[in-house]
């Protein structure tokens, strides 16, 4: 692991600090932009050319990140100061080997290994971190899945043991849904579905993400700093809108910090963790953990001061730089600048060379802006952009973000124009 840092070099010179992004989506793009602002050299890797982060990196490589030899060829050539996984589909053996050879994997290889596998993560949350979660069971056959769902009770959730972005998950309302849940896990998981986890349904008030960041303080000690919890909702298992602050009780907020601290202390390392939780009244349950910036955390591009979005916080931690904070009742808190919200811009069709219109109207709305990710290909449900909005009232920010997102239309080379109004579930307007 790196040491506390007081100096930085200059990109593309022999004094440069280098970061290697394994995954080059919209989250990696924002990390790269923050790195550019500090003169850090950026190398971006992904499975396809011209991925978002590649468009703002110094160099890029295209290849299969499940291929250990490919990853080693890049690492040996670039010799990065930090290797930053941005996605789940990465060869884990390679990450452990990089650490063994003295490379800094963010936050560490073990945390990545745990977080991307739901059984390892759930056992870590319950047995090591000792934090509350929903009840759960595992199934490896269809008969076991019927039995597990019956014991957990309906409704419940089934999820492939290794996946991301809600792929391979299903909301099971009764026994008649189980064959579909089995098929969903086996055919759509982004990873492995040799085992399926069945989770109790929590009738929560709000789903939140705590963006806990482990970093060196001004004295060179590792501390954890907590921004305000981010509220969000999902549609079909994928993030659709987020806002900060999350509008939860003071007691629940302190429990969020307590749970996030226990989890990140167990996982260790340096960097930002997106810790997903359910909140109902004053009760909080841990759900999942992402050992990297979180899609719901894009709201911090508006709600936090410049340079201190979740991406800026992650980069500071990775580089060994301090992050300001204030101790309040035993927790180190990061101040929010203004309440803000996000709303996604998603594709309804498949095709290349996406185009967007309605921007003149959208960009005329005060206290809102549009971020387009620059993805060269669209497919149904793919996130191609996001709207950021801010207001002294977080409810107004949520409405504004939603309103502006629904002003945007998009098309591809092979499709007609379509708007965002095809999806209105959970919307405010």
UniProtKB/Swiss-Prot annotation:
Positions of N(1)-(5-phospho-beta-D-ribosyl)glycinamide binding: 26-27, 86, 295, 375, 382-383
UniProt keyword annotation of Ligase present: yes
Domain named ATP-grasp: residues: 123-319
Record's keyword annotation contains Kinase: no
Residues annotated to bind Mg(2+): 276, 288
Domain of life, per lineage: Archaea
One Pfam family matching this protein: RS_preATP-grasp-like
Pathways per UniProt: Purine metabolism; IMP biosynthesis via de novo pathway; N(2)-formyl-N(1)-(5-phospho-D-ribosyl)glycinamide from N(1)-(5-phospho-D-ribosyl)glycinamide (formate route): step 1/1
SUPFAM superfamilies, A to Z: Glutathione synthetase ATP-binding domain-like, PreATP-grasp domain, Rudiment single hybrid motif
Catalysed transformations (reactions): N(1)-(5-phospho-beta-D-ribosyl)glycinamide + formate + ATP = N(2)-formyl-N(1)-(5-phospho-beta-D-ribosyl)glycinamide + ADP + phosphate + H(+)
E.C. numbers: 6.3.1.21
Keywords from the UniProt entry: ATP-binding, Ligase, Magnesium, Metal-binding, Nucleotide-binding, Purine biosynthesis
Binding site for ATP: 118, 159, 199-202, 207
GO terms (BP aspect): 'de novo' IMP biosynthetic process
Record-level GO cellular component terms: cytosol
GO MF entries: ATP binding; magnesium ion binding; phosphoribosylglycinamide formyltransferase 2 activity; phosphoribosylglycinamide formyltransferase activity
PROSITE patterns xref list: ATP_GRASP
Similarity field: Belongs to the PurK/PurT family.
Subunit structure: Homodimer.
Chain's role: Involved in the de novo purine biosynthesis. Catalyzes the transfer of formate to 5-phospho-ribosyl-glycinamide (GAR), producing 5-phospho-ribosyl-N-formylglycinamide (FGAR). Formate is provided by PurU via hydrolysis of 10-formyl-tetrahydrofolate.
PANTHER family: FORMATE-DEPENDENT PHOSPHORIBOSYLGLYCINAMIDE FORMYLTRANSFERASE (PTHR43055:SF1)
Name this protein carries in UniProt: Formate-dependent phosphoribosylglycinamide formyltransferase
The species this protein was found in: Pyrococcus abyssi (strain GE5 / Orsay)
Organism classification: Archaea, Methanobacteriati, Methanobacteriota, Thermococci, Thermococcales
């Amino acid at each position: 692991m790196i040491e506390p840092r007081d100096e930085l070099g200059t990109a593309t010179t022999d004094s440069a600090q280098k970061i290697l992004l394994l995954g080059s989506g919209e989250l990696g793009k924002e990390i790269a932009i923050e790195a550019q602002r500090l003169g850090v050299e950026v190398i971006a890797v992904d499975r396809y050319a011209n991925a978002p982060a590649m468009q703002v990196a110094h160099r890029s490589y295209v290849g299969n990140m499940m291929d250990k030899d490919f990853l080693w060829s890049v690492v040996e050539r670039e010799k990065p100061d930090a290797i930053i996984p941005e996605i789940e589909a990465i060869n884990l053996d390679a990450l452990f080997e990089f650490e063994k050879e003295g490379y800094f994997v963010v936050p560490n290889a073990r945390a990545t290994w745990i977080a991307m596998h739901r059984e390892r993560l759930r056992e870590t949350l319950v047995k090591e971190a000792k934090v509350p979660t929903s009840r759960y069971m595992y199934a490896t056959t269809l008969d076991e899945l019927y039995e597990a769902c019956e014991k957990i009770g309906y409704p419940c959730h089934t999820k492939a043991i290794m996946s991301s972005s809600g792929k391979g998950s299903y909301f099971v309302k009764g026994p008649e849904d189980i064959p579909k849940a089995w098929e969903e896990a086996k055919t759509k998981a982004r990873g492995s579905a040799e085992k399926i986890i069945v989770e109790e349904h929590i009738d929560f008030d709000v789903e939140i993400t705590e963006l806990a960041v482990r970093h060196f303080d001004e004295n060179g000690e590792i501390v954890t700093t907590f921004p305000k919890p981010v509220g969000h909702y999902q549609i079909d298992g994928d993030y659709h809108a987020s806002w900060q602050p999350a509008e939860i009780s003071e007691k629940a907020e302190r429990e969020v910090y307590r749970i996030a601290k226990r989890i990140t202390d167990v996982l260790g390392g340096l960097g930002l963790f997106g810790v997903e939780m359910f909140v109902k009244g004053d009760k909080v349950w841990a759900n999942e953990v992402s050992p990297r910036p979180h899609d719901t955390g894009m709201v911090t591009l508006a709600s936090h001061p410049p340079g201190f979005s979740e991406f800026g916080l992650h980069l500071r931690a990775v580089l060994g730089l301090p992050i300001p904070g204030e101790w309040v009742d035993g927790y180190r808190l990061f101040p929010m600048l203004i309440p803000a919200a996000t709303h996604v811009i998603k594709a309804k069709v498949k095709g290349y060379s996406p185009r967007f219109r309605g921007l003149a109207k959208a960009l005329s709305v005060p206290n809102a802006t549009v971020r387009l990710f620059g993805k060269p290909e669209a497919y149904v449900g793919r996130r191609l952009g996001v709207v950021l909005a801010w207001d002294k009232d977080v409810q107004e920010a949520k409405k504004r973000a939603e309103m502006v997102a629904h002003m945007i239309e998009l098309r591809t080379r092979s499709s007609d124009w379509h708007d965002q109004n095809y999806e209105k579930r959970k919307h405010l307007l």
